[in-house]
From Swiss-Prot:
Record's protein name: Eukaryotic translation initiation factor 5A-2
UniProt KW Disulfide bond keyword: no
GO cellular component: cytosol; endoplasmic reticulum membrane; intracellular membrane-bounded organelle; nucleus
N-acetylalanine found at: A2
Organism: Homo sapiens (Human)
Keyword Endoplasmic reticulum attached: yes
UniProt GO molecular function: ribosome binding; RNA binding; translation elongation factor activity
Length: 153
């Protein structure tokens, strides 16, 4: 039959974001600002004006780059909130600037770059010292980055 549909390449259909009313957002929560997943560090609401809704002023820090983003939106409007997943993997080795990580199921991931800056130096230092460490990887909006390191249990 030529009409058969092949689903083998499809994903689970889970969205990388979900909508939430602006007035329901809270400090230390997450929101998408200027297309980037951010943690809300500052939030203020202006009073309802003569010509419209109360406005919410949001200030967020990109969870991956640390860059600051701001946005203002009416309190009744919906904003996108990123679905954030955090996983811990055991560090096996570092090769050509990439991390080799062991998953809970015993599979090896080699697609994650060694982070730049202090965290990258700390991971490399502990690896070179022969310490067993776990790397915390945060995933949001089809991006994954190593965000923390801790000793293995």
């Amino acid at each position: 039959m030529a009409d058969e549909i092949d689903f083998t390449t499809g994903d689970a259909g889970a969205s990388s974001t979900y909508p939430m009313q602006c007035s329901a957002l809270r400090k230390n929560g997450f929101v998408v600002l200027k297309g980037r997943p951010c943690k809300i560090v500052e939030m203020s609401t202006s009073k309802t004006g003569k010509h419209g809704h109360a406005k919410v002023h949001l200030v967020g820090i990109d969870i991956f780059t640390g860059k600051k983003y701001e946005d203002i939106c009416p309190s009744t409007h919906n904003m996108d909130v990123p679905n954030i997943k955090r996983n811990d993997y055991q560090l096996i080795c570092i090769q050509d600037g990439y991390l080799s990580l062991l998953t809970e199921t015993g599979e090896v991931r080699e697609d994650l770059k060694l982070p730049e800056g202090e965290l990258g130096k700390e991971i490399e230092g502990k690896y070179n010292a022969g310490e067993d460490v776990q790397v915390s990887v945060m995933c949001a909006m089809s991006e994954e980055y190593a965000v923390a390191i801790k000793p293995c249990k």
